[in-house]
Amino acid sequence: MKKATLVGIVFVLMVVGSASRWTALAQEATKPDSAEIKQLLDKTKAIAGSDWSETFDFFCAMNPTRANRPDDPVIEPAKVLDNLYVIGRTSTAVWAITTSAGIVLIDAGYGDQLESVLLPGMKKLGLDPAQVKYVIVGHGHADHFGGAAYFQQRGARVVVAGPDWDLIEKSPAGPVQPPKRDVVAVEGQPITIGDVAFTPVMIPGHTPGSMGLVFPVKDGRTTRIAGIFGGSILTPGRLTNDGMKQYIESVNHWAEVTKRMKVDVEIQNHPMYDNFLTKLDRLKQRKPGQPNPFVVGADSYQRFLGVMSGCTTVQLMRRA
């Protein structure tokens, strides 16, 4: 038998074996939910109500596989609150906060989309990229730190949690230059830029150094408290059981902190499951005196997190 033929047979056997293995896993993963799981689903759906039904459908889906893509539609850049802006794509958002000391970015998007998405989006909102003083990265993946080096080279500081600085430095070489190690975020130690203090909360699971942020925002004469959970798991199949358990603990820890700090504005860096597009549309049509759709209220925010925690627990139970 010729060597090429033998290699071809081995390759076919590997493909068939791999396909069979994935088929078996899929069949196992789609087995009917147990009575216990159905009970938790019903409880979580009740927590979701109508306002967080999108969150429930996304996270409690059987075999969720929808992740963000770099070619998802670009959103119309928007001023969400008096000092809070959003730029990016429907699945990967960059948030800009104006302070008395300059602009702070939460994440910096894809590195190869600076000139096509982030910078023109900022300019459309009247935000000068040269005034970016800090970039705070929610977690150490390239769709979040991609543009950070650009701003760092122009004088901005870059903030990442310690474990994710390690992750960034170990990232394989590619076309996107990562930022150089700079400020290390620490749980509960505020990062104050001008008149705004950002409180980091460690939420490991998606990455070892995933981080949430709590900070004040302006809503007319009212000060609101915004929260961004910077390490959402979109496709739980990528995590081990221990990783899922750690993530659930992180969501619950985040819930405790945000309840104590009275977070009432909900935003995400992967806004695929929180009515983001609906809220942007309502914001665009909002008339003077009408409530801001991003101000969800403290109780509603906790229900949102209850759905995240409940659905992730469901996904873990489905593996048993």
Q: Positions of the model-derived regions?
A:
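Bacterial N-terminal signal peptides
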Residues: 8-21
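Metallo-beta-lactamase
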Residues: 63-64, 73-74, 79-82, 131, ...
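Accessory terminal helices/loops
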Residues: 15, 24-70, 220-223, 231-320
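Active-site HxH/HxHxD metal-binding segment of metal-dependent hydrolases
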Residues: 31-42, 46-48, 112-116, 120-190, ...
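Active-site neighborhood of phospho(di)ester-bond hydrolases with catalytic His/Asp-centered motifs
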Residues: 106-108, 133-141, 159-161, 203-205, ...
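Positively charged n-region of N-terminal signal peptides that target proteins for export
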Residues: 1-4
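Conserved beta-strand hairpin/beta-sheet module of binuclear metal-dependent hydrolase folds
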Residues: 70-125, 129, 212-234
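Active-site environment of divalent metal-dependent phosphoester hydrolases
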Residues: 113, 140-146, 166-168, 208-211, ...
